[in-house]
């Protein structure tokens, strides 16, 4: 026991000291510098310290008319939706309705490949009949989904022939997949009622939003968002209208505000809403990541000596061990959106950035570093040479 305690103290003492949160004026100056250097038109920022929101501000504009971006402006959450989904899935695990290890096939009334998903809900789920010739779908678990190791592509419609297929044995490696998230959504929403499934994920996530006071957040479009809504800007600075998403898709349909989402991130930093065991599972290094960059999908892994040793998939996020100790992060991106969430476990400190301009990505590393110091966030892996590009 004493040896383990001494080792823990040594690791803590070896970590770089946490820097004080900069002053409001210096934060504002840093944001304006990043926006000027990248050309980004709008950016919203939240800073969390000791699990509490300490700073919240929106900068720039929300649309081509020049309407100001505000802390209550509805913005696109993009793939930060996946972390909210993972959190919700782990609550189902806590309730005994799901196991991370049980093959998802066991939660269905019939084989996955027998479902006509377009008849159930058009354009919501994957074309699972495409998997009929590959029995590996029977082995996919919730853990595989949440660690991006199902073997699916990011989305089936990105395949040359637009057919869903499994590219590697489930659980054997990391390759980012929104399609995997959609499979787990399908199982939760259409699974066996005698196992406690057949649940509406829009309602499940909304229950968390309501509990946390996130009144302007939803995984499906709400007309009351329209009066104060952010459009986007692509990498040419061209305005792109906000997509009014008509169905819940856990891979990335969340609309939110910086005020709302900072409440979720703060709750996550406080370990709130999950059992101790489920929180530990979420943050545990589950699957080592050995590629140079996150994209393209199925990229070859680097030689072992060139791989980053501390880079792992957690559940619904990426975990790492940087100069300040263990941390986690998740990004969100589309052609006109750039989001990032970075948290350091020690001190329960986080930075959350939502931008309605994809060009802001190119300044995330600088801005997060200014606020939190050197965290070790693997931005080069996250973006490669694509930061700020549509």
What are these regions (language model features)?
Residues 32-40, 52, 64, 89-97, ...:
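Sec-exported extracytoplasmic/periplasmic mature domains
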Residues 36-44, 65-121, 126-143, 166-180, ...:
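Short active-site loop at a secondary-structure junction
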Residues 1-8:
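Sec-dependent signal peptide recognition
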Residues 114-334:
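Short, surface-exposed loop or secondary-structure junction motifs
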Residues 21-76, 97-99, 120, 158-168, ...:
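Short, conserved catalytic-motif segment at the N-terminal edge
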Residues 327-330, 338-357:
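Short, well-ordered beta-strand elements
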Residues 13-15:
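N-terminal signal peptide c-region/cleavage motif recognized by signal peptidases
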């Amino acid at each position: 026991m004493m040896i383990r305690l001494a080792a823990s103290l040594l690791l803590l003492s070896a970590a770089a000291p946490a820097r004080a949160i900069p002053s409001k004026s210096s934060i504002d100056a840093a944001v304006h510098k990043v926006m000027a250097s990248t050309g980004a038109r709008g950016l919203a920022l939240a800073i969390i310290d000791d699990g509490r929101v300490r700073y919240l501000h929106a900068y720039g504009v929300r649309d081509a008319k020049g309407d100001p971006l505000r802390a209550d402006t509805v913005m696109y959450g993009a793939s930060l939706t996946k972390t909210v989904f993972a959190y919700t899935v782990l609550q189902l695990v806590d309730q005994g309705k799901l196991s991370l290890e049980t093959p998802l096939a066991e939660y269905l009334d019939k084989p996955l490949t027998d479902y006509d998903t377009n008849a159930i809900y058009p354009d919501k789920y994957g074309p699972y009949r495409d998997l009929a010739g590959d029995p590996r779908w029977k082995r996919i678990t919730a853990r595989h989904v949440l660690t991006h190791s199902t073997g699916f592509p990011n989305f089936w419609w990105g395949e040359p022939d637009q057919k869903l297929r499994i590219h590697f044995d489930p659980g054997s490696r990391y390759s980012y997949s929104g399609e995997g998230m959609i499979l787990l959504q399908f199982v939760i929403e259409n699974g066996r009622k005698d196992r406690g499934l057949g649940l509406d994920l829009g309602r499940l996530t909304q229950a968390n939003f309501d509990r946390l006071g996130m009144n302007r957040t939803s995984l499906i479009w709400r007309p009351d968002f329209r009066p104060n809504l952010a459009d986007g800007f692509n990498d040419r600075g061209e305005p792109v209208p906000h997509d009014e998403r008509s169905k819940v898709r856990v891979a990335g349909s969340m609309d939110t505000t910086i005020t709302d989402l900072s409440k979720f991130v703060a709750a996550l930093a406080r370990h709130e809403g999950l059992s101790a065991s489920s929180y530990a599972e979420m943050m545990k290094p589950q699957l080592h990541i050995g590629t140079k960059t996150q994209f393209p999908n199925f990229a070859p892994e680097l030689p072992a000596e060139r791989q980053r040793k501390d880079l792992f998939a957690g559940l619904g996020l990426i975990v790492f061990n940087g100069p300040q100790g263990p941390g986690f992060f998740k990004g969100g991106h589309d052609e006109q959106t750039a989001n990032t969430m970075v948290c350091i476990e020690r001190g329960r400190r986080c930075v959350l950035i939502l931008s309605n301009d994809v060009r802001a990505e190119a300044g995330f590393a600088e801005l997060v570093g200014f606020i939190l110091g050197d965290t070790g966030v693997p931005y080069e892996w996250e973006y490669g040479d694509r930061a700020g590009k549509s």
